[in-house]
């Protein structure tokens, strides 16, 4: 009778080093931690990219991209010059100043064509933001 192929010893079994269960538990926990940390909490935002162009005199053009995890009825916007989740109605009606985009002490005015807003500082400096 020929020997059963299942009872024979495998030659490649010793090729892999033995790893303890502690190692695998650590690897699983590390991967879960990485997956958990890459997700935002509901109602929060983070800046992903920020580019500044100061090639023109007396003018700086800044572009930023934010990633938000907004709740139902909210959409990514700006509050106090930071990315934030705001009421979707504000974006639909283009009433930008309703989301309080300017810093405290600054005045907010809509652009004539409602394509953005301006924040006027007490000293007269004006920051213009357009929405794309």
Swiss-Prot record:
One of its GO terms (biological process) is negative regulation of vascular wound healing. InterPro entries: Chemokine-like_TAFA, TAFA-5. One of its GO terms (molecular function) is G protein-coupled receptor binding. Keywords: Cytokine, Glycoprotein, Secreted, Signal. It comes from the Eukaryota. GO terms for cellular component: cytoplasm; extracellular space. It is found in: Secreted. Expressed in the subcutaneous and perirenal adipose tissue (at protein level). Highly expressed in adipose tissue with moderate expression in the brain and ovary. Isoform 2: Brain-specific. Glycans are attached at residue 113. Residues 1-43 form the signal peptide. Belongs to the TAFA family. This is Chemokine-like protein TAFA-5. It comes from Homo sapiens (Human).
């Amino acid at each position: 009778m020929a020997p059963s192929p299942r009872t024979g010893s495998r030659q490649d079994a010793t090729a892999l080093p033995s790893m303890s269960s502690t190692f695998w538990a650590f690897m699983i926990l590390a991967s879960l931690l990485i997956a958990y940390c890459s997700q935002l909490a509901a109602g929060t935002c983070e800046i992903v990219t920020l580019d500044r162009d100061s090639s023109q005199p007396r003018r700086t053009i800044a572009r930023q991209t934010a990633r938000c995890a907004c709740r139902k009825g909210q959409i990514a916007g700006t509050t106090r010059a930071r990315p934030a989740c705001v009421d979707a109605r504000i974006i639909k009606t283009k009433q930008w100043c309703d989301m309080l985009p300017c810093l405290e002490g600054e005045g907010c005015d809509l652009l004539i064509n409602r394509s953005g807003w301006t924040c006027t500082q007490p000293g007269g400096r004006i920051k213009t933001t357009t929405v794309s």
